[in-house]
A protein has these predicted regions:
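Histidine-rich, glycine-flanked metal-binding segment
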Residues: 1-19
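Short loop/helix-cap segments at secondary-structure boundaries that form the rim of catalytic
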Residues: 2-8, 151-157, 337-339
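Conserved beta-strand scaffold positions in the cores of enzyme catalytic domains, especially
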Residues: 8-12, 77-79, 345, 351
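Divalent-metal coordination cores built from histidine and acidic residues
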Residues: 13, 18, 22-25, 36-146, ...
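Acidic/histidine-rich helix-loop elements
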Residues: 29-33, 86-100, 166-177, 234-246
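Active-site microenvironment of metallo-dependent hydrolases
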Residues: 40-43, 262, 274-276, 284, ...
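Helix N-cap / loop-to-helix initiation motif
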Residues: 73, 125, 290-297
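Active-site neighborhoods of metal-dependent hydrolases
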Residues: 109-120, 124, 171-289, 362-388
Length: 388
């Protein structure tokens, strides 16, 4: 942007609250199923940067380029290719590796496609984890991570993509069977320069505490019918004492890490959870656990920008940074629940208004067949990495 250059359009947000564009630090681009709905939903919920933590490399390159070229309405995408695994894979988006030659071919392809992150998966042996991390640092200049805080931290990785998720090593668990984390885990995330992408699936229970969220046009119009059915079902179930206790236990871990100086980037693992909406449930969970509005918001703005090495350009509202902004019809610093009332976003200075995003999609008569779409939703989420 050249100094003194007149704007072609002025946006009056004087009666709104403007914050840095939100990040979702753990997503999986799934255009083959969601079409343009996934990227539009993210914008509609105020997300201007999405971090892919696994998917098909060529498809992600296409999405990233289409967004940058203005051909696809969506957040900027930090792309990761397929999950780098050992001799077997868990998902279609994984790549199996038995030899160093095979791994080097995959990494050469990663360089050609300009990956923004390198992720190893649960059957990857130590040498795969280390060589992938080294390649990411030395050749790509990007971060690397996995599900494993140990041996991930010992092998040079930068973060874990969950607090606890699927894994194959008995000694790699970050939490106990009852969801508790202890001093050793907190020390890894606070004193070793090792970071955490938090994905609080337990926050989904909070949907039942605010059932009006299910009537939002972003749910009834933008979401595909299987997600609309899931949200409506969950909204009709007030959170139980047991669910809130489990949620509180997880939030206590995050609070301890943040209090100790650790960096937490908030993610969702969408579309395993409702796209866009779940980020707000997770933010509400953090605020409910005692974080101030500003502290909670930093986990989806400044801190992910730092975790992924993009804080020179993103994460705060400062002159000279990229114009990624979320415009809110309310003041989340006095009423945090209004954060979800996204009026518009700017991604790289390009304006997307809520009314336009919703207006581009029509309703589907088949949405009323609730049981059919609930079954579709269950099948799509079957055998995922984490319990909802």
């Amino acid at each position: 942007h050249r100094a003194g250059r007149p704007a072609a359009r002025h946006v009056d947000a004087s009666d709104r609250t403007v914050i840095p564009g939100l990040w979702d630090a753990h997503t999986h681009p799934w255009q083959t199923t969601y079409g343009g709905r996934q990227t539009v939903l993210q914008l509609a919920y105020g997300i201007t940067t999405a971090v892919s933590l696994g998917g098909f490399a060529y498809e992600q390159a296409r999405i990233r380029e289409a967004v940058a070229a203005g051909e696809l309405a969506g957040p900027r995408l930090l792309a990761t290719g397929e999950l780098l695994d050992g001799p077997r894979v868990a998902y279609s988006m994984g790549r199996a590796h038995r030899t160093r030659e095979g791994l080097q071919r995959t990494l050469a392809r990663a360089e050609a496609l300009d990956w923004d992150f390198v992720k190893t998966y649960v059957r990857a042996p130590g040498w795969v984890m280390k060589e992938a991390a080294d390649f990411g640092h030395e050749r790509l200049g990007v971060r690397s991570g996995s599900h494993l805080c140990t041996p991930g931290v010992q092998l040079g990785q930068d973060l874990t993509t969950h607090l606890q998720a699927t894994q194959r090593l008995e000694f790699g668990h970050a939490t106990s069977a009852t969801g508790r984390a202890f001093q050793d885990v907190r020390e890894i995330y606070t004193s070793a320069g090792f970071h955490l992408v938090a994905t609080p699936f337990t926050a989904l229970a909070l949907l039942g505490a605010d059932p009006a969220l299910a009537d939002d046009p972003r749910v009834t119009v933008l979401m595909p019918p299987w997600d609309t059915a899931l949200v409506r079902e969950q909204a009709g179930q007030p959170p139980t004492a047991a669910q809130l206790a489990t949620l509180g236990k997880e939030m206590d871990v995050y609070r301890g890490i943040l209090a100790g100086g650790g960096l937490i980037a908030l993610g969702t693992d969408q579309p395993l959870v409702p796209v866009g909406l779940h980020l707000h449930l997770a933010l509400r969970a953090l605020h409910r656990a005692g974080l101030s509005p500003a502290e909670a918001l930093r986990t989806a703005t400044l801190l992910p920008a730092r975790v992924f090495g993009a804080d020179a350009d993103l994460g705060t509202l400062q002159e000279g940074k990229l114009a990624d902004l979320t415009v809110i019809d309310g003041d989340p610093f006095t009423d945090f629940a209004t954060l979800i009332r996204t009026a518009a976003v700017l991604r790289g200075g390009v304006l997307f208004e809520q009314s336009d995003l919703v207006g581009d999609f029509g309703t589907d008569a088949g949405r009323d067949v609730k049981e059919k779409w609930l079954e579709v939703s269950r099948r799509m989420r079957r055998e995922g990495c984490c319990d909802l």
